[in-house]
Amino acid sequence: MKKKTLAIDTPFQKSDAYGALSMPVYHTLAYEFADADVMSDAFCGRIEEPDYSRVMNPTVNYLELKIKALTGADRVTAMSSGMAAISGALISLVEQGKNVVSSRHMFGNTYSLLTKTLPRFGVTTHLCDLTNLDEVRSAVDADTCCIFLEIITNPQLEVADLAALAEIAHEHNIPLVADTTAIPFTEFNAHELGVDIEVVSTTKYLSGGATSLGGIVIDYGGFPEFARRLHDEMLFNLGAYMTPHVAYMQNLGLENLNARYAMQVRNTEYLVNALRGLEQIKSVNYVGLPDNPFYALAQRQFGKTAGCMFTIDLESKEACFRFINKLKLVRRATNLFDNRTLAIHPASTIFGSFTDEQRAAMDVLDTTIRISVGLEDMDDIVEDFRQAL
């Protein structure tokens, strides 16, 4: 069965007494068992049946099984948010006295997790230029637990060579962990490029309309102890599982993701090319542009698709604020990959709590505006940009 069909019709939905076409929302916490033996088997993991909705729920499990089939993963775990997926994956890999190798370019909350939260538990992070493979090789040592990266960094839009990083990771018998939120897992196969574990904020593409918060960890089975820790410790002990209502909504989003994403990519390409000729804009950064330094690598890795996020640079922070304040159709909101086109000033929002020195080290500039492209008629959005400039 091909992916477009599998996203809608799957063999995993159990029969429903009423013939429901959509997977029902099982809004229940506990489950009744036929007898004590079955109950014991479920709780001890000898059979895979729902026992408590903090660790398994039929609606959530349906979404997990569908994504597992779409990706070819060994196991998919649905989490309460994208950050829950990232923190859950990393906590399941690290130990006191160990370290993570990652990029200087990443989402602000992920940076805080790696540089503020994990160090409190004795875990350090080596931040380096992941596009410089010699620097990565020097950063990895005997205490490194994993290499972690975003496949397209937010908001710097840097792309690293996944296959090359995977080779370095596997030489040291550690996993390559990738936040693949920027390109839907339906569009490219990260595992074929060497990624061992994917983390995804399903708040973005799967939600679409900014109506549900979730995340997933996609595990390709190369590190069995990771799978045990994620299930036994993150779900049982920390309670970061997705809720059934969110799973229901995100399953609906997954059904039409293919159509939405194709239109958003077309819209992004149209908008980017329309803006490149405007004199008020100093530069447009999009990995889908042929003159972008990461274009060839992105095309090779992501199946000739570059996502729906780009940035523009204006002359100053003040010019950025004036532009954002004058927008009428484009929304001032920090979400990504929404049905609506969104614009933010990253330096003063998602990196607003960072010092000037930290932002400079991460190449987060005061002159940059991040754009996430939606489903509107792009002629209207271009006109909105023109009047705001």
Specify the residue positions occupied by each region the protein language model found.
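Glycine-rich beta-alpha junction loops
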Residues: 12-14, 27-33, 204, 256, ...
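Short conserved active-site loop signatures built around small residues
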Residues: 1-26, 217
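Conserved N-terminal alpha-helix of the aminotransferase class I/II PLP-enzyme fold
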Residues: 30, 35-84, 109-116
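Conserved PLP-enzyme active-site core in the AAT-like
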Residues: 7-13, 75-280, 285
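PLP-dependent enzyme catalytic core of the Aspartate aminotransferase-like
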Residues: 115, 124, 138, 318, ...
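Conserved small-domain helix->loop->beta segment predominantly found in fold-type I
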Residues: 269-328, 332-340, 354-360
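Short, well-ordered beta-strand elements within core beta-sheets of diverse protein domains
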Residues: 249-259, 307-315, 370-374
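Short, solvent-exposed beta-strand edge segments and adjacent coil->beta transition regions
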Residues: 47, 212, 247, 305-309, ...
